[in-house]
């Protein structure tokens, strides 16, 4: 595929799967976990990836919340590093534009890490 075909394929893939992506994001938002404790997020994301045909290796580098997912063979090789941790004290109800915690003092997502 040429560059424009690749671009169209990617946009179509995102559009075709937007409900799945949004549900995963919302699930991670509703279950905020601090750094190195993101077990729910890891299971959510790796399950989604495995169901989409990715090969997933969990516990990478001795970290139970780290994983590598691979799809296909050959080139191009595309990689990225992502975070899905919440921050302490940022509990926030979804769709609220003012401080409105689910639980006062609890962790929450304030940096978009749930959007992976």
Feature locations, PLM:
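Acidic/His- and Gly-rich active-site-bordering loop/insert found
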Residues: 3-109
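Active-site alpha-helical elements of protease catalytic centers
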Residues: 110-116
């Amino acid at each position: 595929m040429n560059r424009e075909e690749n671009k169209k394929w990617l946009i179509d893939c995102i559009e075709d799967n937007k409900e799945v992506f949004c549900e995963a994001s919302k699930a991670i938002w509703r279950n905020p976990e601090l750094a190195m404790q993101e077990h729910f997020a890891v299971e959510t994301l790796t399950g989604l990836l495995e169901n989409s045909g990715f090969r997933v290796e969990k516990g990478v580098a001795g970290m139970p919340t780290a994983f590598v997912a691979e799809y296909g063979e050959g080139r191009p090789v595309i990689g990225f590093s992502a975070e899905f941790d919440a921050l302490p004290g940022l509990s926030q109800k979804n769709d609220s534009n003012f401080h409105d915690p689910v639980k006062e003092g609890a962790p929450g997502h304030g940096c978009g890490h749930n959007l992976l």
